[in-house]
């Protein structure tokens, strides 16, 4: 198994994304894919997340990251078959392949829900070094609620994926950037972005709105994963996965 075979087996072709989408990824560093998760899948994913939040309680998200002011979950690969469709989606994989441009793998599969009155993040990039001519990471935000200015939508700065890190380039990454754009889209959409792009969550200014999302994060295959999938993978998870899905996780033992 290799990446080309894995992507083919998962339904990725040269026509999975179009030239305009590729251009947006190259120029802006992000695109929004509409209607990726249908209503039934949305309901199933939301229900499983809520079960996990209740089950894991204060320990939720501890495998990767916990955040004050947000509900977090980590290691979703092992926490429900309903999540398999997330990291194996052909439209998203085609975008990831276009951005990274070489062999890649899943880095982590996590969830985040910024609570009312919380959620503001400074602009940041997910790769901790300045652009060196290659792209090493690419992320996707799966919207499980409608994203709006009210519930803390994500902000991104188009074209920033080839710039220095925002911590170096900006006086205050917490402030609004004059060029920032917002992920305003209905539930079921997926925002795919080159993770070198400056981005961050905005404040959930509502009193009662959820802002649930799954972060499906990929990295070039030579890099370490945010969560070591080989180390964490449960046997029952491994058994149900296709060889192509195992390859994306980098748990293929062949």
Regions found by a protein language model. Name each.
Residues 1-28, 34-131, 247:
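Non-heme Fe(II)-dependent double-stranded beta-helix
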Residues 36, 196-197:
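Short, surface-exposed secondary-structure boundary micro-motifs
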Residues 109-111, 140-142, 214-218:
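A structural signal for short, well-ordered beta-strand segments
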Residues 118-184, 223-233:
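Catalytic core of non-heme Fe(II) oxygenases with the double-stranded beta-helix
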Residues 2-10, 55-58, 197-198, 202-254:
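Non-heme Fe(II)/2-oxoglutarate
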Residues 124, 193, 199:
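Histidine-centered active-site/metal-ligand motif
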